[in-house]
């Protein structure tokens, strides 16, 4: 009985949070004005075929990234896991920057560099001050084009990825949705 009451209480809290969000908007007009103030996304294509999506929110921070249509869905028995592996290896250094130099440069900008792999894509991105977008783009380009794949880093990341795979395999929800 106590568990059932606890479950109802949790559901009620979730519902009430939703009601509070709706109350913030006093009318449909307010919702419409809010939606109209979302910056438009402009998509352009470079001569090399690369598509660039951009929004100018006027904010002092920005997120820039590279979304690559290469996730686990594109893999087969021979190259299974390669997108995830390359995502892990990307931040181990480049021809121009060691791993430490890369970390310090990003940290000194006050930026955040990250990546993830899904079934559909592999993503590399940086969150930074708007004024630092050109530098963040240069760093991302260096990582994508010039990553070093050292033997010791490969061995270390291999064990990290194998451990992550074990965690995913033990999570029923991850297995079902994969």
PLM regions and their residue ranges:
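His/Glu-rich zincin catalytic helix
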Residues: 2-101, 125-128, 138
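Acidic/histidine-enriched segments that form metal/cofactor-coordinating
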Residues: 17-25, 29, 94-95, 99-178
């Amino acid at each position: 009985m106590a568990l059932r009451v606890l479950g109802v209480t949790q559901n009620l809290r979730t519902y009430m949070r939703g009601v509070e969000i709706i109350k913030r908007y006093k009318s449909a007009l307010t919702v419409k004005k809010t939606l109209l103030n979302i910056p438009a996304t402009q998509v352009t294509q470079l001569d090399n075929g690369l598509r660039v999506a951009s929004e100018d929110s006027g904010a002092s921070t920005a997120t820039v990234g590279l979304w690559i249509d290469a996730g686990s869905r594109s893999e087969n028995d021979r190259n299974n896991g390669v997108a995830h592996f390359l995502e892990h290896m990307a931040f181990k250094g480049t021809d121009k920057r060691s791993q430490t130099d890369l970390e310090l440069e990003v940290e000194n900008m006050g930026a955040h560099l990250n990546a993830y792999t899904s079934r559909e894509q592999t993503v590399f991105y940086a969150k930074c001050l708007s004024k630092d977008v050109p530098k963040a783009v240069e760093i991302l380009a260096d990582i994508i084009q010039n990553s070093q794949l050292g033997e010791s880093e490969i061995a270390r990341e291999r064990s990290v990825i194998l451990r992550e795979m074990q965690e995913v395999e033990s999570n029923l929800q991850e297995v079902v949705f994969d």
